[in-house]
């Protein structure tokens, strides 16, 4: 369901790949002997996910979505990006007659929080708060606001049926709070890190409330697990990992993930965290960036075409089948001179633009273009791409010889912030 096309890179992957190294890392991943191997729970999750908990989530989600118009999803980083990526990719940006998902806890902007509070005052809403520890600043202070808003509106007893916590199985501030107040809880597995957690209750529960077919998401992830089992370049995830690693070793500093579909913007944000937080350490790693074409061609297209070379390469997501399509209507006066497009659909025009841009950037601009060919934008495809990117990331990070599953650098800003806020115990 994902094919890696290297026709626009001038790279002979069979010549640049170290097949013995790929086999070695493949064994390291699946035998769980590499750095950070305690966090490889995602590897077999499409098979080993907790079926009993999943059925319980379905029951709770069905009950909740019959009571609310809006679900406030409170989390930051991996606690919300994957869910939002799935929601927008599958349902689109302007879905109707379904529970709306609104995301908070991902910012400390007072203006944004105030706007969400005002929006919810006349809405029936529930809360899904997601935090392993329950002490992360952004979701913690956000949950205080929206829990109070909900309890003040419906009372504590009613709120118990409208608040769900996704957290640690046994410990942590959020787990203790949920048990004390009687909120339903589901578990964040100990062996799956936040940026890998979208197929756990972290992402699956809010998506169930939104009405997305999560059974198909799991089917897609399982298909990817079965497809991506080989220890050579026939494995498309490894092919992608190897070519991006080769370009990094050639001196490229940035990879731009390009989509021609606006509803994939949050997918690119999820991808940026997955690769940036996993590889950006020990003074190594590509800077993951993203653009939406053709929109960003009108702002960054000039730089991409004629800016510095050997700095950035592009990875393009190409969608074979759009969720919907429509034709350009004819205008009798042809005032804009665009009647020549009336026999073409918007998707045909979009795909033609993609081809033209790839030619401009890769041939004229001498910028390598990797093309990831996706079949569609649905539930099954989402599950597939999650597993594809996570496995590709594991291979890519081990090729860099870094631990894909830790993030020690993020503690620096947290310490400085806590010190400035006079947090107890911080000196």
From Swiss-Prot:
Gene: pgi
PROSITE patterns the UniProt entry points to: P_GLUCOSE_ISOMERASE_1 (PS00765), P_GLUCOSE_ISOMERASE_2 (PS00174), P_GLUCOSE_ISOMERASE_3 (PS51463)
Molecular function (Gene Ontology), one example: glucose-6-phosphate isomerase activity
Domain of life: Bacteria
Pfam families: PGI
HAMAP family assigned to the protein according to its UniProt record, in alphabetical order: G6P_isomerase
GO terms (BP aspect): gluconeogenesis; glucose 6-phosphate metabolic process; glycolytic process
Pathway(s) where this gene product acts: Carbohydrate biosynthesis; gluconeogenesis; Carbohydrate degradation; glycolysis; D-glyceraldehyde 3-phosphate and glycerone phosphate from D-glucose: step 2/4
Reaction it catalyzes: alpha-D-glucose 6-phosphate = beta-D-fructose 6-phosphate
Record-annotated active site: 277, 298, 414
Predominant place of localization: cytoplasm
The keyword Hydrolase is assigned to this record: no
Protein name per UniProt: Glucose-6-phosphate isomerase
Enzyme Commission code(s) on record: 5.3.1.9
Function per UniProt: Catalyzes the reversible isomerization of glucose-6-phosphate to fructose-6-phosphate.
Family, similarity comment: Belongs to the GPI family.
Gene source species: Mycoplasma capricolum subsp. capricolum (strain California kid / ATCC 27343 / NCTC 10154)
Keywords assigned: Cytoplasm, Gluconeogenesis, Glycolysis, Isomerase
InterPro entries (UniProt xref): G6P_Isomerase, Phosphoglucose_isomerase_CS, SIS_dom_sf, SIS_PGI_1, SIS_PGI_2
Location in or out of the cell: Cytoplasm
PANTHER family assigned to the protein according to its UniProt record, in alphabetical order: GLUCOSE-6-PHOSPHATE ISOMERASE
GO annotation, cellular component aspect: cytosol
EC main group: isomerase
């Amino acid at each position: 369901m994902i094919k890696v096309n290297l026709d626009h890179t001038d790279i002979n992957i069979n010549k640049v790949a170290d097949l013995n190294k790929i086999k070695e890392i493949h064994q390291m991943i699946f035998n769980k002997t590499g750095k950070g191997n305690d966090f490889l729970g995602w590897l077999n999750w499409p098979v080993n996910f907790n079926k009993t908990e999943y059925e319980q989530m379905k029951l709770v989600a069905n009950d909740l979505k019959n009571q609310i118009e809006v679900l406030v999803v409170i989390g930051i980083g991996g606690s919300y990006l994957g869910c939002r990526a799935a929601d927008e990719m599958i349902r689109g940006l302007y879905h109707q007659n379904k529970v709306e998902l609104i995301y908070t806890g991902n910012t400390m902007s007072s203006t944004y929080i105030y706007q969400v509070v005002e929006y919810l005052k006349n809405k029936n809403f529930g809360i899904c708060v997601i935090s392993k520890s329950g002490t992360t600043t952004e979701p913690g202070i956000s949950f205080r606001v929206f829990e109070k808003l909900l309890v003040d509106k419906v009372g504590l007893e009613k709120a118990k049926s409208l608040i769900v916590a996704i957290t640690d199985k046994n410990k942590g501030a959020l787990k203790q709070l949920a048990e004390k107040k009687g909120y339903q809880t589901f578990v964040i597995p100990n062996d799956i890190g936040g940026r890998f957690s979208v197929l756990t209750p972290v992402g699956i529960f809010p998506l169930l409330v939104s009405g997305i077919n999560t059974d198909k998401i799991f089917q897609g992830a399982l298909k990817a697990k079965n497809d991506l089992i080989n220890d050579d370049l026939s494995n498309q995830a490894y092919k992608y990992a190897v070519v991006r690693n080769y370009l990094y070793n050639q001196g490229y500093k940035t990879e731009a993930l390009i989509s021609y579909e606006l509803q994939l913007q949050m997918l690119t944000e999820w991808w940026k965290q997955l690769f940036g937080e996993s590889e950006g350490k020990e003074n190594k790693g590509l800077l993951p960036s993203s653009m939406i074409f053709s929109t960003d061609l009108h702002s960054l297209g000039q730089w991409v075409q004629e800016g510095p070379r050997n700095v950035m390469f592009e990875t393009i997501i190409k969608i074979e089948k759009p969720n919907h399509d429509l034709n350009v209507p004819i205008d009798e006066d042809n005032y804009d001179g665009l009647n020549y497009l009336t026999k073409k659909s918007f998707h045909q025009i979009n795909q033609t633009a993609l081809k033209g841009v790839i030619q401009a950037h890769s041939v004229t601009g001498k910028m390598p273009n990797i093309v990831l060919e996706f079949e569609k934008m649905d539930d099954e495809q989402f599950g597939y791409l999650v597993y594809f990117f996570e496995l590709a990331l594991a291979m890519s990070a081990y090729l860099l010889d870094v631990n894909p599953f830790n993030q020690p650098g993020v503690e620096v800003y947290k310490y400085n912030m806590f010190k400035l806020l006079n947090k107890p115990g911080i000196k």
